[in-house]
Swiss-Prot record:
Record note on quaternary structure: Homodimer and heterodimer with RACK1A or RACK1B. Interacts with GB1, MEKK1, MKK4, MKK5, MPK3 and MPK6, but not with GPA1 or MPK4.
Molecular function (Gene Ontology), one example: ribosome binding
Protein's job: Minor component of the RACK1 regulatory proteins that play a role in multiple signal transduction pathways. Involved in multiple hormone responses and developmental processes. MAPK cascade scaffolding protein involved in the protease IV and ArgC signaling pathway but not the flg22 pathway.
Record protein name field: Small ribosomal subunit protein RACK1x
Phenotype when the gene is knocked out: No visible phenotype under normal growth condition.
Stored SUPFAM superfamilies: WD40 repeat-like
PANTHER family tied to this protein: RECEPTOR FOR ACTIVATED PROTEIN KINASE C RACK1 (PTHR19868)
Length: 326
């Protein structure tokens, strides 16, 4: 019996591209999504046939597209970054903004929490990476010199707490690895031929994967700063994530969601959306007229137990895939 992914359900509430999905580390029945509709939605997962989850709360306050969202490890707070140039910390119990982080001079494209939630990092079109405390104070800005020469599209903390590390990806085609203790450059990873949209760090902190315009995923050894190998995705890569419990890497591309087994370096899954069958299911057997439109996945994240893959699309829909056997 092979393991594969099947579409378990869909979640509708956003009215524009779903830019990011955050899942709780305790596997509780919530997720948080961000969108170009300028809102963040807290979902309660019901796992019903008709709808996999319901929008419990919509967090509003950003004045432009929300580009990224992450959850604190206790699941109490969400942190977002927006094209309005700000980060916001949200109390999920009340839906209120508890902190605004002001300092970037252009769109914020990416945000992340350190493992202990005491540090926050953000990346922007102003070409800087900023390190903040949870009070909203900017403690350090990585800019000129070793900094990126173009938009910084993605920034992530390594889960390896022994060697505190930040990894960033940029439109200057490089991935940079930073020592968190002194914010100094450890390695500059060169090999891509186009701008980068995304970087992901493996659960053990040993690897990172990067992708973007050139349609090639590069895998890097984080400790050594060396390229290990490449995987051909075949079209622009918008998001990457590692499975928490299988040696799998998932890529959201403009063609499909592609999943590789990193041991064999083979594609185990290539997930495409069937709008026709989705419409029929939704309308109770009557297809709708929008099956011609091209949609693709822009964001994805696994549940903490690795059983469920949440994927956000350009049509504002969150599609939920579950591990099945066939």
């Amino acid at each position: 019996m092979a393991e594969g992914l099947v579409l378990k359900g869909i979640m509708r509430a956003h009215t524009d591209i779903v830019t990011a999905i955050a899942t709780p580390i305790d596997n509780s029945d919530i997720i948080v999504t961000a969108s170009r509709d300028k809102s963040i939605i807290l979902w309660k997962l019901t796992k019903d046939d008709k709808s996999y989850g319901v929008a419990q709360r919509r967090l509003t306050g950003h004045s432009h597209f929300v580009e990224d969202v992450v959850l604190s490890s206790d699941g109490q707070f969400a942190l977002s970054g927006s094209w309005d140039g700000e980060l916001r910390l949200w109390d999920l119990a009340t839906g209120e903004t508890t902190r605004r982080f002001v300092g970037h001079t252009k769109d914020v494209l990416s945000v992340a929490f350190s493992t202990d939630n005491r540090q926050i990092v953000s990346a922007s079109r102003d070409r800087t990476i900023k390190l903040w405390n949870t009070l909203g104070e900017c403690k350090y800005t990585i800019s000129e010199g070793d900094g990126h020469k173009e938009w910084v599209s993605c920034v992530r903390f390594s889960p390896n707490t022994l060697v505190p590390t930040i990894v960033s990806a940029s439109w200057d085609k490089t991935v940079k690895v930073w020592n968190l203790q002194n914010c100094k450059l450890r390695n500059s990873l060169v090999g891509h031929s186009g701008y980068l949209n995304t970087v992901a760090v493996s659960p053990d902190g040993s690897l990172c994967a990067s992708g973007g315009k050139d349609g090639v995923i590069l895998l890097w050894d984080l400790a050594e700063g060396k390229k290990l190998y490449s995987l051909e995705a075949g079209s622009i890569i918008h998001s990457l994530c590692f499975s928490p419990n299988r040696y799998w890497l998932c890529a959201a591309t403009e063609n499909s969601i592609r999943i590789w087994d990193l041991e064999s370096k083979s594609v185990v899954e290539d997930l495409k959306v069937d709008l026709k069958s989705e419409a029929e299911k939704n309308e109770g057997g009557v297809g709708t007229g929008n099956q011609k439109k091209v949609i693709y996945c822009t964001s994805l994240n696994w549940s903490a137990d690795g059983s469920t893959l949440f994927s956000g699309y350009t049509d504002g829909v969150v599609r939920v895939w579950g591990i099945g056997r066939y």
